[in-house]
Curated annotation (Swiss-Prot):
UniProt similarity note: Belongs to the NqrDE/RnfAE family.
Protein name: Na(+)-translocating NADH-quinone reductase subunit E
Subunit structure and binding partners: Composed of six subunits; NqrA, NqrB, NqrC, NqrD, NqrE and NqrF.
Organism name: Psychrobacter sp. (strain PRwf-1)
Cited InterPro entries: NqrDE/RnfAE, NqrDE/RnfAE_oxidrdctase, NqrE
GO molecular function (one): oxidoreductase activity, acting on NAD(P)H, quinone or similar compound as acceptor
GO terms for biological process, alphabetical: respiratory electron transport chain; sodium ion transport
This protein's GO CC annotations: Gram-negative-bacterium-type cell wall; plasma membrane
HAMAP family named in the record: NqrE
Subcellular location field: Cell inner membrane
Function comment: NQR complex catalyzes the reduction of ubiquinone-1 to ubiquinol by two successive reactions, coupled with the transport of Na(+) ions from the cytoplasm to the periplasm. NqrA to NqrE are probably involved in the second step, the conversion of ubisemiquinone to ubiquinol.
Amino acid sequence: MGHYVSLFITSVFIENMALAYFLGMCTFLAVSKKVSTAIGLGVAVIVVMSITVPLNNLLFQFILKNGALAWAGFPDIDLSFLGLLSYIALIAATVQILEMFLDKFVPSLYNALGVFLPLITVNCAIMGGVLFMVERDYNFTESLTYGVGAGFGWALAIALLAGIREKLKYSDVPAPLRGLGITFITVGLMSLGFMSFGGMSI
C-alpha cells in the first residue's frame, strides 16, 4: 500500500506533468484565466488520464508487447511498433465519449471548455502519462495510481495558476509583461516551488 501512496504523491508533486515536465502547456496557459473553467478542464484531464493510462497498460501488456500474444498462440509477434498509433486512438475514443457525456449532461462546462476539450486528445500530458507508464513498465494497479496522480497533479497546477491569474487582474503589472509575459514568469516561479518537493523521501 505504501508503494502506491508513494507513487501517487510522486506523480502529483515531484513529477508534476505541468510544472516538472512542462507537458500540456497549450491548454495549461489558454484555459487558466478563470478558476471555474480551469477546474472543469482539470477534472476532465483527471478522468481521461485515469481511464487511458490503465487501459493502454492492458493494451500494451496483452497485445502490443513483444510476446504478449502468446495467449493467442503467437508468442513471437511483436506489435510494439504500433504503440503510438494505438495509444492515440484509445485516448481519442475516450475523449470523444467524455465530450458527448458533457454535451448531454453538463452543457455549461462543455461550452466553457469550447475547443480545448477536443484538444485533450492531443494534449501531450495525456500521451506523456501513457509513455511514462510504458517506459517504467508499471503493472495495471500502478498504472491506475499513476494515471490518477498525474491527472490530479496537472489539475492542481492549472487551478493554482488560474487563481493567481485572477488575482493578477487587480495588480499593477508593468505594461510589457501583461498577458502571457507575467503568466510565464508565474509558471516559472510555481515550477521552482514544486522543485522543493524533489527533496522529499517517501
